[in-house]
Amino acid sequence: MHGVVLDADSLGPDLDLARLRGQLDHWDWHGQTAPEETANRIREADVVITNKVVLDADAFAAAPHLQLVCVAATGINNIDLDAAREHGVTVCNATGYGTPSVVQHTFALILALATRLPDYQAAVRAGEWSRSPFFCLLDFPITELAGKTLGVIGYGTLGQGVASIARAFGMQVRVAARPGATGIPVDRVAVEDLLEQADVLTLHCPLTDATRGLIGRAELERMKPAALLVNTARGGIVDEAALADALRAGAIGGAGMDVLTQEPPRDGNPLLADDIPNLIVTPHSAWGSHAARQRLVEQVADHIADFRAGRPGNVVAGPEGT
């Protein structure tokens, strides 16, 4: 079988790929693939691995031998699943590989925002501590998390992991009902109510029609003035212009964003302005520990092996209409 990797550079240069390479006899490895290159590169492929390269209907139509697409990520919005089904192609995604790393990163953002770590570090580097008449600086308000309420939207393994750490800090945890769902389970609260209750709101839901723009201007206005918002889920869930305005106006207390609507943000982004207080933007790196990336590669290798053995796993679309 002939395999094609479309964006190997997105996995980093420091991984052990021996087991993955051993799954197929012939590979074409591409560090990056531009949209106009995709169809030609997969024309002879039986198996394609993509992280973020888009496979649309034209790409599937151009690949008559294609049997399996392995998405080297959890999100699958770069794959036309209907086209995959139409062409009898099985699509598998990867899950769970980054959970410890994303949970760690999420809570690192929460702690940094609550303690105003970037602001105090900048003040020290600017010499403000050296010039202080006292032994400390107290220029920025520090929030103690114990007793505060963590609101979670998206309560899969990531949301549950962050909630577990929050409880260890003495926080109360409240979980939103699934956006777009009818009815609210007894152990959940409506998103609208959670916005008003949460001192820290953390997002771990997928980007769907129900969650696109979920946190917009009206939702930010419902949040507490000192509330913190953290998004390590997907860009597009938060209205970035509205968030920038809310932070400048002091409508909420701070925000940590590991994802943006366009990545990388080549055309600029409202959240990249340098006048926004208590905002931390990280470059979609929450998932990026070596351990997480190696687990991802091993999982993709498993998917290929399982497919060849006739028992594909983590199937999100298949010729049987999955």
Roles of regions detected by a PLM:
Residues 91, 226, 232-322:
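Rossmann-like dinucleotide-binding domain for NAD(H)/NADP(H)
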Residues 158:
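Hydrophobic/small residue at the entry helix of a nucleotide-binding pocket
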Residues 56-61, 172, 178-270:
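Rossmann-like adenosine-cofactor binding region
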Residues 72-73, 89-100, 177, 233:
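Short beta->alpha connector loops at strand-helix junctions that form conserved
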Residues 1-47, 170, 174:
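N-terminal glycine-/charge-rich "phosphate-binding" loop or analogous flexible N-terminal tail
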Residues 87, 95-149:
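Phosphate-binding beta-alpha-beta segment of Rossmann-like dinucleotide-binding domains, i.e.
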